[in-house]
Amino acid sequence: ENPDIIVITGDLVDSNHMDIDIAIKFIQQAVKISPCYYVTGNHEAWIGDIYYELEEQLLDAGVTVLRDEVITISNDKDSIQLIGLDDPDFSDQAPYLQESMLEAKLYNMNLKDGFKILLSHRPEFFGVYVKNDIDLVLSGHAHGGQFRIPFIGGVIAPNQGFFPKYDAGEYHEANTTMIVSRGIGNSIIPVRINNRPEVVIVQLYSQ
């Protein structure tokens, strides 16, 4: 594949088995392929001040780190607003306040008309993304539901509990599409069943 951009939607490192060197080696190869854009996940929040060492190395490698920021990327014909939300675990807010916090962040960005892509680690806040008229959300966090039951889906996901609503694949509501990657890691539960790791390829067509 020859992608125009590569996006990483958090949990580049595992707070339980952290190896920044491995993550940076991957990044150094990825930036040779295409421009890379990155947002944090909960595991980055959980490693404390070590995160800033990781971020510095990402920036040195040429990665664009989006922490509650919006930028515009363009080609010869079209432009896209690319939005990056920091994982809510970086804040001191209680979990039940995280949804309203993310909603306020998006509102305060004063997003313009036009196609908008949001990078956000957390799929469970899909309703917030829909409310803010995001066209495409790229997310992760759910590990594909860890164990997948045929015709039912994932069994468990962080912050969603058993039989999560947003575990993997595409979700559509109003004018918003969300794609949740199963990712390539395991984290706390070191086993996947019927749940192959994946790297998602998205192709956009202008109208």
Model-derived segments and spans:
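Short acidic-hydrophobic surface loop/beta-edge motif
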Residues: 69-76, 169-174
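Membrane-embedded segments
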Residues: 1-64
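Binuclear metal-dependent hydrolase catalytic cores centered on His/Asp/Glu-rich metal-binding motifs
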Residues: 56, 60-63, 75-116, 126-127, ...
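Short beta-strand-to-coil "C-cap" segments at the C-terminal boundary of structured domains/repeats
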Residues: 202-207
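Solvent-exposed loop/turn segments at secondary-structure junctions
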Residues: 12-15, 42-46, 71-73, 87-90, ...
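Conserved beta-sheet core of the metallophosphoesterase superfamily
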Residues: 28, 122-200
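Active-site neighborhood of phospho(di)ester-bond hydrolases with catalytic His/Asp-centered motifs
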Residues: 5-11, 35-42, 66-69, 117-120, ...
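Acidic/histidine-rich helix-loop elements
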Residues: 12-21, 44-52, 89-98, 151-163, ...
